[in-house]
């Protein structure tokens, strides 16, 4: 909760700097895959922590940031989404639901048609991150698809974070950004 408040205050504090810019970008990339496992064993505190980090913080930050950058002609928000937002996976009910919330937020914000604001919820694909290591270490009884993720790692099929970052920035700073509310970086 403290980090969320700091993020919102930081967005509000940046108003002076943003007013001098012609283009500003907000990337909501925080994500927590835990709790993993079926309901009944997830724990209320873990569920609430995931919802706070994966949904409440990005939405509150986006709201504060849009207000703080009102005078900037080109504002762009990208929510880093996941295939889990669009496909249900056993053991990931909380993660799927929270990522789907970001997709729906982007769709609804596009309908708001705020002047100078573009938004997308963008799934990057499977990237070689600490989250992936955590997923691969999960017991199959909690996440039946763990073998698929272990295989992607074993076969060298994970994308590097730097490659994904370059492709993501190329797209986010490009003219086509915001044409669709929900996209997959691999299809761009």
Where do the PLM segments sit?
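Rossmann-fold cofactor-recognition segment
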Residues: 1-5
């Amino acid at each position: 909760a403290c980090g969320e408040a700091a993020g919102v205050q930081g967005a509000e504090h940046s108003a002076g700097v943003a007013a001098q810019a012609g283009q500003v970008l907000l990337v909501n990339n925080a994500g927590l895959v835990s709790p993993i496992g079926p309901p009944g064993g997830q724990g209320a505190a873990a569920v609430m922590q995931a919802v706070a980090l994966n949904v409440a913080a990005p939405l509150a930050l986006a709201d504060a940031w849009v207000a703080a950058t009102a005078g900037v002609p080109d504002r762009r928000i990208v929510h880093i989404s996941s295939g889990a937002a669009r496909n249900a996976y056993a053991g990931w009910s909380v993660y799927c639901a929270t990522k789907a919330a970001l997709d729906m937020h982007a769709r609804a914000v596009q309908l708001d048609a705020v002047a100078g604001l573009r938004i997308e919820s963008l799934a990057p694909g499977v990237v070689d991150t600490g989250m992936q290591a955590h997923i691969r270490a999960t017991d199959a009884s909690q996440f039946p698809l763990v073998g698929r993720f272990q295989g992607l790692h074993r076969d060298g099929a994970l994308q590097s974070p730097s490659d994904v970052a370059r492709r993501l920035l190329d797209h986010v700073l490009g003219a086509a950004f915001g044409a669709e509310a929900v996209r997959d970086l691999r299809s761009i």
